[in-house]
Amino acid sequence: MASNPVLAIVFSAVLAATAGCASGPPAPPEVPGALQPPAGQALFLEALASGVQIYECAPKADQPSTFEWAFRAPEAALVDRAGRSLGKHYAGPTWESPDGSSVVGEVKGRDPGPDPSAIPWLLLNAKSTSGNGVFTPTKSIQRVRTVAGVAPAEACTAAKAKQIARVPYTAAYYFYRAAP
């Protein structure tokens, strides 16, 4: 799928606008109850993501003669509000820092969010962490403020089997650890 220069400009503008916000500790986002982290956890990191959601045209698991765009993985750069690199986000889902620490999440809550043309908002639990760094204390992760990233609207047919679509998206990820 060809990249869309208009979307690239919009995503860049969104990141630039948030980069100018006041610094200091991030405030927890307002989210529906299903996306609240468990009691006893405190927000410690906000990461702004810009990248793609990767889909593959594949047979449906329960109807192999019918095809659909199946989600495969995210691929995104993570930055703070000042635009400094915090790492990358990829399949797992995994968030990895240049300091070698990483966290792998599993979805625990989902909400469609306010924009039907964007991927849903999520609450994830940390399934595992590795390394000793920024992501090591993570217990929960929220994905909110999503823009775009949904599966292509074009039909997925047998003729397009195994075709890959890389759909641009942005999101904010909030990381929680055990409260002190």
Per-region residue spans from a language model:
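Bacterial N-terminal signal peptides that target proteins for export
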Residues: 1-10
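Extended, amphipathic alpha-helical scaffolds
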Residues: 12-15
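C-terminal motif of bacterial Sec signal peptides marking the signal peptidase cleavage site
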Residues: 17-20
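Primary mode marks residue(s) on the alpha4-beta5-alpha5 output face of response regulator receiver
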Residues: 25-54, 61-180
